[in-house]
Amino acid sequence: MKTLKHHAKRIVENFYLVLILIFLYAPIVTMMVLSFNSSKSRTQWGGFTLQWYTQMFDSATIMDALVNTLLIAFVSALIATIIGTAASIAINSMKPLPRTIIMGITNIPMLNADIVTGISLMLAFIAFGISLGFQTILIAHITFNIPYVILSVMPKLKQTNKSTYEAAMDLGASPVYAFFKVVFPDIRPGVLSGFLLAFTMSLDDFIITHFTKGAGINTLSTLIYSEVRRGIKPSMYALSTIIFLAVLVLLLITNFAPGRKKEEH
């Protein structure tokens, strides 16, 4: 009787899991299939084609948006990683109470609604007389990426042995040399994960970018939004598919990085 109940429970659990996966990924799979459909119809299959991908890469508007997206994602992730790593070191050296308070404040931007962050940054830029454009998107992305870097680096810093750093200093090493030779190798997996996570978050962002971009500049997410409002084109399916696959690859790299595997073993 117990065995029968156990099997029934497993069947229900597996069915529930499959149902969740279908609801989550069926729309994405449908979009990916339509990106290879030669027919513009969303209900009829006209045969396999790559013309929508060719059309996408031939579009100057899409290529400009792609360059903007990659440039903003890379630069913002790089700067956020540098600032976030430095901030993590400073926070880690604090006493327990102020460290807890600062970490709580740091976590607020991650818990805050993107629309609130986007509007707040837009109003701040306007108040300081900064014209909305490429630079404001970059600043906004650096701002919301820093907490994610701190979140990735802090656990690694807590695992480091402070005595080795102090020993290097006692042996005559400068603080910078001691950091890069002793501390950085230990926190490197966390720094790399923070960079990849920041790059992914920047690549995928729409709401904050929408409020801080100004006129005359687009990223892939804002371009897709503006194009969809005029009517869905098959090239948008192709573009969305590429974005999804790019984000998926980055997440896989982040989760299966050599440093993380080593840590788990």
Give the positions of each predicted feature.
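Transmembrane alpha-helices
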Residues: F15-Y16, L21-I28, I150-V153, N161-K162, ...
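Membrane-embedded alpha-helices of multi-pass transport/permease systems
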Residues: A26-V29, V33, I82-A86, I119, ...
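Interhelical loop and adjacent transmembrane-helix boundary motif
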Residues: L4-K9, K40, W52-T61, L203-A257, ...
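N-terminal, non-cleaved signal-anchor transmembrane helix
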Residues: M1-A60, D64-V67, L71, P258-H265
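Hydrophobic alpha-helical transmembrane segments of multipass integral membrane proteins
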Residues: M63, V67, L71-I83, A87, ...
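C-terminal transmembrane helix and the adjacent membrane-cytosol boundary/short C-terminal tail
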Residues: K2-Y16, M154-M169, P175-F184, Y237-H265
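Membrane-interfacial helix termini and adjacent extracytoplasmic/periplasmic loops
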Residues: S41-T43, L50, I115-F144, V176, ...
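Transmembrane-helix boundary motif in ABC transporter permease subunits
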Residues: M1-R10, V75-T106, L123, F179, ...
